[in-house]
């Protein structure tokens, strides 16, 4: 009886501590998601709901004039995911490996590596706009002084360089996060495996390739999931540096920016299209949800295998 009473008391405390998080999730995630889903199936005039639309809003999204915008934005999101995942993961592993082998000052360099992650987006945007200013920015000034003036260009003003530049800025800001995740994964590896490999004559490169890298699988999956979600919800940096229209000339447009334009309307895009915007929101949610579910399933399998 005493054991049952203790378990019952523990359940009460567990429920008590989980309640705030559950209420927050329901209020700020579940309810808005369900509301957006319902909006997608109605016609709208401004912010006034009209009759039931069925799948008409989805049909309009894949028809002129929204189809080309959608496909362009989707392509940009896919390119952003590929670029960020490949480069950020590689740099994150290299940084983590370097930090792992530091004998002194690891805490300091770990802090420096993670510092850009906590910077305000306003600060990041203003700083990089200043750095990349085509006339007064230090980047073009340095290139000109080095005799590389042919490389100097309006990095954020050219349709060929704007998106890669924003991806680079995103990498600079977030690379510290996967580095810390991978560092935690390296620290979790038993030193017995490493010492046994060294005794057998394995080099540090062989130890990394044969032992460390495979055991970073769960960390790699976590980073993959978070990168996928972040890439297909990418809004902040393009919005701050390119505006809601994905300037220049839509070269940095993303699904999230398109959703914003459709849901709220802009001076360039005209009046809002809540129904079509909500349909786009549902599609974004489905893409992110399916990607996250696949990644979570892979992560569970790797945990079972290990």
Regions found by a protein language model. Give the residues of each.
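A structural signal for multi-pass alpha-helical bundles of membrane permease subunits
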Residues: 4-306
């Amino acid at each position: 009886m005493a054991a049952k009473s203790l378990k019952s008391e523990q359940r009460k405390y567990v429920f008590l501590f989980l309640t705030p998080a559950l209420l927050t999730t329901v209020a700020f995630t579940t309810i808005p998601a369900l509301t957006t889903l319902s909006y997608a199936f109605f016609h709208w005039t401004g912010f006034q709901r009209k009759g039931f639309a069925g799948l008409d809003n989805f049909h309009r999204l894949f028809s002129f004039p929204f189809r080309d915008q959608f496909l362009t934005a989707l392509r940009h999101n896919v390119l952003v995911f590929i670029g960020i995942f490949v480069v950020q993961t590689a740099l994150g592993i290299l940084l983590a490996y370097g930090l792992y082998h530091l004998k002194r000052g690891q805490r300091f360099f770990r802090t420096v590596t993670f510092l850009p992650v906590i910077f305000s987006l306003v600060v990041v945007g203003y700083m990089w706009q200043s750095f990349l200013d085509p006339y007064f920015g230090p980047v073009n000034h340095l290139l000109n002084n080095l005799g590389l003036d042919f490389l100097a260009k309006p990095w954020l003003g050219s349709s060929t360089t704007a998106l890669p530049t924003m991806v680079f800025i995103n990498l600079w800001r977030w690379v510290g996060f996967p580095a810390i995740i991978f560092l935690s994964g390296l620290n979790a590896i038993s030193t017995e495996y490493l010492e046994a490999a060294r005794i057998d004559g394995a080099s540090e490169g062989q130890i990394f390739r044969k032992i460390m890298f495979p055991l970073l699988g769960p960390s790699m999956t976590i980073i993959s999931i978070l990168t996928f979600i972040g890439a297909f919800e990418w809004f902040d940096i393009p919005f701050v540096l390119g505006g809601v229209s994905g300037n220049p000339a839509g070269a940095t447009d993303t699904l999230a920016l398109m959703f914003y334009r459709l849901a709220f309307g802009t001076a360039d895009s005209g009046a809002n299209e809540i129904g079509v915007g909500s349909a786009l929101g549902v599609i974004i949610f489905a893409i992110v949800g399916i990607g996250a579910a696949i990644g979570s399933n892979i992560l569970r399998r790797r945990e079972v295998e290990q």
